[in-house]
Amino acid sequence: MLNAVGIDVAKHKSTVTIRRPGDEIVLPPCDVHHNQAEINELIDYIKGLEGETKVCMEHTGRYYEPIVHWLSSAGIFVSAVNPILIKDFNDDDTFRAPKTDKADAAKIARYALDRWTKLKQYGHMDETRNQLKTMNRQFGFYMDQKTAMKNNLIALLDETYPGANNFFDSKAREDGSQKWVDFVYTYWHVDCVRGKSLKAFTEHYQKWCKRKGYNFGVRKAKEIYEMSSGLIAMFPKDDNTKMLVRQAVDVLNSTSATVERLRREIDKLASTLPEYPVVLAMDGVGTTLGPQLIAEIGDVTRFTKRGALTAFAGVDPGGDQSGDHERKSNRTSKKGSPHLRKTLFVIMDGIL
């Protein structure tokens, strides 16, 4: 006896129904709120069913994660499937397509019965992959914030010290700090440099480099001084201007530190997965893009052939043929994960 539990998950509640082959309804669609009492009641009900029971739900957003964790921790078979598979599934032979929580739960239950032997059980490794994906999305979010903060600082420097962001091209340190950012924190206005003599600035710059742990060069000091001599600043050298620039630097440094910490933690977590050494051995992939690729692909073993992975990324050309018409060149479907496509693009851009 097969029991298919279909769960349509929302933020604060889920709609649950239980079906058996032959469209037998064991439990009509009902709402279960996400609290300990109602979840435990649902667990007891599912465990009390006769026969084999499998729970199926869509892995949409983050809402499904508490439910799948609670049920799987209770020893119940739970499978979280791609919502596109549920959307494209239709066994009703009807033109009606109701979009309600009850209808969705029933559709998920019917899908579970139809794909009974193919349902993959959610496990501890899936929790690691979900955590990795969340960290990667946070990494992308803070990278966007870092870019915005960097552009904001450069815009302020255009008013106080034009071109100062181009004085150095050194890469970011492990803590996220960069030489040009630290430089403009101390020399936040062009008059902070040209207001001194060349000798005085060179000595001050040398002490600054030693204190910050940066390389010092007399030629570089002279170059900065000469470039600063002819610049025009729109904002005056006063406390308000100093506050604006230094505040922008502080925010940028804080965001940069978060980005670098996430970068390290993502790599550390990804290294616990079995595919990590294989992915890092690929061309164009390092300790940043490798973990991102692993995070966005998820469990690669669920793809039975390479075409399935291509379709998941949405880079497969769809067919366009009808009668005598057959298109030779088709655009990619772009039906899959945009985050995965972005990662793949960055990798290929580096290789080419």
PLM feature segments, named:
Residues 1-352:
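A detector of single, family-specific signature residues
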